[in-house]
Regions:
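Intrinsically disordered, low-complexity regulatory segments
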Residues: 1-169, 173
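Intrinsically disordered or highly flexible coil/loop and linker segments, enriched in small
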Residues: 11, 104, 154, 158, ...
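Short, residue-level hotspots on alpha-helical faces of the histone-fold
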Residues: 124, 173, 177, 198-202
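Conserved short loop/turn motifs at secondary-structure junctions
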Residues: 1-3, 109-111, 188-192, 264-269
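Hydrophobic transmembrane alpha-helix bundles
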Residues: 145, 173-177, 221-224, 228-229
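Long, highly charged, low-complexity internal segments
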Residues: 43-84, 191-269
Length: 269
């Protein structure tokens, strides 16, 4: 029996149809020597600071650097605490049973760093020891899936990809948890920082401030109408006053050639 694990139910349905696993069970498909199951994104995540004995915000506890990081079922917030996501826990139990039923696993999560990490965290959390192969395809057509399943790669060939995803995940945790707690302590409130969210928010705020503070000011440019040509040449330099533009115009040598940096065409009727 082979277990194929996809990243989402829709992909699992397509794979199940192709391999002949037509019997629908809760959280999986089975048949023709295969059981096909799926994840819902990240079912397993890194534990929150509370799991390491840091339930409160304290300057003396920073930075929090877990050694090693612990894996937990995806968490949801309930009030001021976190709890296991019931849907994630239910699907993990189904995946565990699918792994137990199989002799070998085929990893069909998305072909990329995050897809690899999704499977590896599940594999580690369930303490699975079954050998696994990798379905690595860039298309989800029937032809691509069949070809990929006919020549799966040894899953261990993607160890470095997994380690890359693992490093990214742990780096996000270290930055997000420690920076959020540090700012919250310093400002006396509840603040959230992140490796991606904070720079993104900064770009939005910077653009908002630029738009808010923008003041329209007059400017001048030099225009030229070359003799015998139906074109208008516009200088690239912007002048803050008419006087400066006139002075630049007087300094032009009519014998010099113009250098064209760009051309735009406008049609009028």
């Amino acid at each position: 029996m082979k277990c194929i694990i996809a990243e989402k139910p829709s992909v699992a349905r397509d794979i199940a149809r192709i391999v002949g696993a037509t019997h629908k069970e809760e959280g999986c498909f089975s048949g023709n020597g295969h059981v096909v199951t799926w994840a819902f994104g990240h079912l397993v995540t890194l534990a929150m600071p509370e799991a390491y004995g840091f339930p409160t915000y304290s300057r003396d506890q920073l930075p929090i650097i877990p050694e090693p990081f612990r894996l937990v079922v995806r968490q949801i917030r309930k009030g001021t605490t976190y709890m296991d996501d019931p849907s994630a826990l239910k699907q993990l139990n189904i995946i565990r049973k699918c792994f137990d039923r199989s002799d070998r696993i085929i990893v069909a999560t998305d072909a990329g760093r995050e897809g690899e990490l999704i499977f590896r965290l599940i594999y580690a959390y369930l303490d699975c020891r079954k050998p696994f192969d990798r379905l690595w395809i860039s298309s989800l057509t029937d032809k691509a899936i069949r070809e990929g399943l006919s020549r799966p790669a040894d899953g261990r060939q993607y160890d470095r990809l997994y380690l890359s995803g693992k490093a990214r995940s742990e780096a996000d945790w270290l930055v997000g948890i420690n920076a959020s707690r540090a700012l919250s302590i310093a400002r006396g409130g509840a603040y959230s920082l992140g490796r991606v969210q904070t720079p993104t928010l900064s770009m939005i705020c910077r653009r908002y401030i630029e738009h808010r503070d923008f003041r329209s000011v007059p400017f001048w440019k030099i225009h030229a109408l070359p003799t015998g040509l139906s074109v208008r040449a516009i200088g690239e330099t912007t002048y803050e006053s008419r006087k400066a533009a006139d002075r630049a115009m007087e300094d032009l040598d009519p014998r010099e050639a113009l250098i064209v940096s760009s051309v735009s065409v406008q049609t009028s009727t």
